[in-house]
Amino acid sequence: MSAAELARMDAVLAKQRAAFTAAMPEPASVRRDRIDRAIALLIDHQHDFAKAVSADFGHRSTDQTLMTDIMPSVGALKHAKKHFEAWSRNEKRKAMFPLGLIGAKAEVRWQPKGVVGVIAPWNFPVGMVMVPMAGILAAGNRAMIKPSEFT
């Protein structure tokens, strides 16, 4: 990777981090909207994705791509959409001894971490990006994607 490409990636990462910080805290409706848009993107362009993957492989059935890349991705996104609010609820925990004796309380507060990287292999180029994106978007994070240079 050239120095210019690295500098460009660093600039994009800095913009992603700044946008993440500026938008905090984002409501659940924003996460839901992002997941909905990812689902719509996959469904609306499923045949375009399948044709592109077939052209890259030179022999891969478009039906195989629909079954192994598109459908699992949509399923993961729908699952994340259904459960992300429960996943992000605070969880009460028992305070360590002896702090509990003096009224201490403990809980886990799930929070987005920022910008998450996704490095996808060549063999399932759509699914290996979009399935992790389900969790990334559900958690309220942003992503930088690096697809394989072979597809």
PLM region spans:
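N-terminal Rossmann-like NAD(P)+-binding subdomain of aldehyde/semialdehyde dehydrogenases
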Residues: 1-105
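Conserved small-residue-rich beta-alpha loop and adjacent elements
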Residues: 95-151
